[in-house]
Curated annotation (Swiss-Prot):
Protein family according to the UniProt entry: Belongs to the mycobacterial PE family. PGRS subfamily.
Bias (Gly residues): 408-451
Pfam families in the record: PE (PF00934), PGRS (PF21526)
Organism, scientific name: Mycobacterium tuberculosis (strain ATCC 25618 / H37Rv)
Name of this chain's protein: Uncharacterized PE-PGRS family protein PE_PGRS20
Domain of life: Bacteria
Chain intervals for the UniProt region annotation (Disordered): 231-320, 408-463
Amino acid sequence: MSYMIAVPDMLSSAAGDLASIGSSINASTRAAAAATTRLLPAAADEVSAHIAALFSGHGEGYQAIARQMAAFHDQFTLALTSSAGAYASAEATNVEQQVLGLINAPTQALLGRPLIGNGADGTAANPNGGAGGLLYGNGGNGFSQTTAGLTGGTGGSAGLIGNGGNGGAGGAGANGGAGGNGGWLYGSGGNGGAGGAGPAGAIGAPGVAGGAGGAGGTAGLFGNGGAGGAGGAGGAGGRGGDGGSAGWLSGNGGDAGTGGGGGNAGNGGNGGSAGWLSGNGGTGGGGGTAGAGGQGGNGNSGIDPGNGGQGADTGNAGNGGHGGSAAKLFGDGGAGGAGGMGSTGGTGGGGGFGGGTGGNGGNGHAGGAGGSGGTAGLLGSGGSGGTGGDGGNGGLGAGSGAKGNGGNGGDGGKGGDAQLIGNGGNGGNGGKGGTGLMPGINGTGGAGGSRGQISGNPGTPGQ
C-alpha cells in the first residue's frame, strides 16, 4: 500500500515556484519570437527565400506550441494552488473541531450540553431537537413525523445566544411540535410545526380530526417570538398554534397559525405578546374553512319508490385568533385573525323513479367570528379586528326538494385599544350571510378600539 502526505505550505510554495518558472519561459518565448519567425533571406535568390521561409515557419510552429504549453502550465498551476487551499481549509476545519472539542468537553461531561455549537436535529428515534450550546448556538429542529398519530418533535432551545429550533410536523392526525425557545440574552423562538391532516373516514363515518399546530417558541431578553404552526385539516380541523412571546425587553410577538379546514374547522391561534420595552403584538391566525355538506342519498325506484335523502348540513367555520398585545411602552397591537368561511350545504338526493320525492338541500352554517385586535403600548395603536367569515350557502334541493337555508355571516372582531398616545384599532367587518331558502343574516361589524387618553383617534367600527 502506498501513502501520500500533503503539506499545504509545500504545495503553496511549489505553486509559487511554478508560476515564477512559467513567467520566465513566457518572457523568453516572447523575446525569441521576432528573431525566429521573421527571418530575412540571405540573398535575393529563390533558394535563400525558401530557406528563410522554412525557418520562419519552424519558429511560428514553436510559438504555437509554446502558447499551448503556457495555457496548460497556467491550468496546472491553478489546480495546484486550489488543491493547496483545499488542504489548508480541511486542516483548519480539523483544528477548529479539535479546539471546540476541548472547549466543550467539560460542560458536555458535567451537563450533557456543549458550550458552543448548534443542537442536533431530531430523528425518527429521537424526534426532539437538541439544545444549542450554553454560550452560543441554535437549537436543533424537531423531526417531522411520517407515521400517523405521532406528534412532531419539539425544537431545541438555545443557550445564551441563538435561535430556537423549529418544531416538526405531526404525523397524520397528530399535533405539530412546539418551537424551541430563543437564547436567554438574544435570539428568536423557533416556529411551531404544522399539525398533521386527519385521514379520511369510512363511508358514513366522519374523518379523523386534524392535529393542532405547535406553539411558537418564546424569546429571551431580546428577540421575536416564533410563529405558531398551522392546524391540520380533517374530520374536525386542528387549531392553529399560538405565536410565541417576544423577548422580555424588546421584540415582536410571533404570528399565530391558521386553523385547519374540516367538518368543524379549527380556530386560529392567538398572536404572541410583545416584550416589556418595545415591540408589536403578533397577528392572530385565521379560522379554518368549514367542510361542505355531503349529498343526500337517492331514493329506491320501484312499485313503492323512495324519497331522496336530505343533503347534509355543513360544519362550523373556525373563529379567528386574537391579536397579541404590544409591549408595555412602545408598540402596536397585533391584528385579529379573520373568521373562517362557511361552506355550501349538501345537495338533496334524487327521488326514486316512479314518484319518489327529491330531498331538500342541506343548510349552510355561520361563518367564523373575527378575532379581536391586540392592545397597544403606552405609545402605539391598537390592532385591527379580524373580518368575520361569510356564511355558508344552502344546498340545492333535488327535484321538488327545497333549497337549504343560508348561514349567518360571522361577526367582525373588536379593534384593539390604545393606551396613552395612539389610535384605536378599526373593528372588523362582519361576514355576508349565505344564500338559501332563508338567506343568512350579515354579521355585525366589530366595535372600534378606544383612542389614547392624551391624543389619538378612536377606531372606526366595522360594517
